[in-house]
């Protein structure tokens, strides 16, 4: 038998036990469970324990059945004899054995250290051999065999002790190290992780729990089973069980759910919900800043000051940049009298302005009275001595008022062209801007420039932008108005400067501005009458080729209520229509088209309207026309159409035969009846269930007209001749509403009775509208009335429509 074989057979490596890790934790590291270098000193302590316990190996006797005759350990030439006596069987004395025990040391469990033990035993035998020079080589070999057999049996008995179960053995250590290395190298290999956990569970179940809960490795069902087994072995499962004393709920279902996810390879979710397990507590930190009220107030004050300073700096820098930019354009930074800045007024002088851009009184038509007064002002400027020799003074201000489009600005342009003096003009909205004080400064600049060129005229268009009644919340506008009041009639007299202004809303102007001394003359520019409309049409048609059928007087009579702007638009639309059609001259048909477009709106020929809707619209408009033809005081019909125009599906237009300055009660009641004609016709022909929303605008107009008659004109017997304010008492408002409803119901009944009497004419006119779509007044009369009766009815209607209420 070889030496290595003998060593392998004698060296016992018992399995590790769990208690060894509990008793001697210093021998193992927490991560890899490898043996520490401190184990060597522990081995020395074990050796001293064995020595103190007087451990001695049992005597070894060699018998024939123990040693073969052909053994390598028995020399062939020796005179060894096998005997049965006790003395002959005793190979080593007690003294020699004690000396060998004293020199014996345990160094380790590795094979290299066992070789060291052989060397120590050999040294002991050599010392014994020196003492007994007579012993032979054969006895030394037998002594070694007996010694190793005794050591083997002693180690087997010692290893059975629990407190020595920590003995490190290289084979199991290397196996664990190999499994740990492979598992760490492949964290997503569930098979390797399961094998490692199973091996650790045999020796260190606490390590299984720790490794599993680190969540750094993928596990399968085997790993989960090993984890549960470790929890049971270490009694860590009690952390997830309910506790009736403390009221702790059971977290075992959450644990099992988590293990189910872990078995599927999910490592992202938390192991257990925070706050359920003691290992995963829910940490709550209470923050209670100990800041006094004074400190908090100081902090808020400092932050507010810093924010205010920052905003102020940004505002100042922005204003400076804007001022610099405007100054570079000739604005605020470079203002001054005579400069090209926005403060400098615009001057219009006939000597420096081309003649084509200047209007004269020859271009002003339809307002002879206003033009006459302005001609007197121009004459005063041209020849002041003619008026001053009798003590007359130049008027300081002239205010032009009137409806939009009547020619107020045109009159100012005519004065600029007629007068031989400088003409300064500004719009009311040009005074004010984003900076406070700009308006007042521009007013001063305007009058300073005018003083240097007196006598002159200053014209302010739309003066209500700055001259309206002063209000508390419009401080910047008040400053501009105050400066204007001072310049017009203040402490310093401005001789030779006439201020002209135009506005559509004279009622909202400040009384201080409209008083004598500032605006001495108030000139109203009304809408033109028939003669004025004829003059305006001749002016705009001048220079345009016209056909022989154009009757300017007829157009003027057929456009009551048109102002100068409307007539200019009419001629322009007709000219465009003629150009589109390729006509060489303007015809009456084109002028009539322009008139209808202004009065009735643009035709919508492409709009799809169903036959039922057309039929309903035809009867609706026929009801209006029948009532207008058979009601005293109603305006003559201009046209009736079911062609969609603007937002309406059809309409009946009426134009007064003469210019109206006031309206009688009969005419107002006739308007109410005409408004009700469409709704009553729908009800009579189609029934109450088929009336439509087409009459909503008619009812709205009728209600407003009845309200106006009762509350403003005093045309109600129950209310009396009283003008009701905007906010009457509740009792008065109830009485007004009752009278309005009464007027509307009476009109409804009158129209219903009238249409029942003329139902045949209603059907005839509706069928004609369905066939022709548009009918003029002559067409309607020719269809419904005989020729003589139609002429007689027209004369009677015009007589009844004359003015009866001044």
Curated annotation (Swiss-Prot):
InterPro entries: AAA+_ATPase (IPR003593), AAA_lid_3 (IPR041569), ATPase_AAA_core (IPR003959), ATPase_AAA_CS (IPR003960), FtsH (IPR005936), P-loop_NTPase (IPR027417), Peptidase_M41 (IPR000642), Peptidase_M41-like (IPR037219). One of its GO terms (molecular function) is ATP-dependent peptidase activity. Induction: By high light. SUPFAM superfamilies: FtsH protease domain-like, P-loop containing nucleoside triphosphate hydrolases. Residues 106-116 have a biased composition (Basic and acidic residues). GO terms for cellular component: chloroplast; chloroplast envelope; chloroplast thylakoid membrane; mitochondrial inner membrane; mitochondrion; plastid. PROSITE patterns: AAA. The active site is at residue 621. Its EC number is 3.4.24.-. In the N-terminal section; belongs to the AAA ATPase family. This is ATP-dependent zinc metalloprotease FTSH 11, chloroplastic/mitochondrial. It comes from Arabidopsis thaliana (Mouse-ear cress). The lineage of its organism: Eukaryota, Viridiplantae, Streptophyta, Embryophyta, Tracheophyta. The gene is FTSH11.
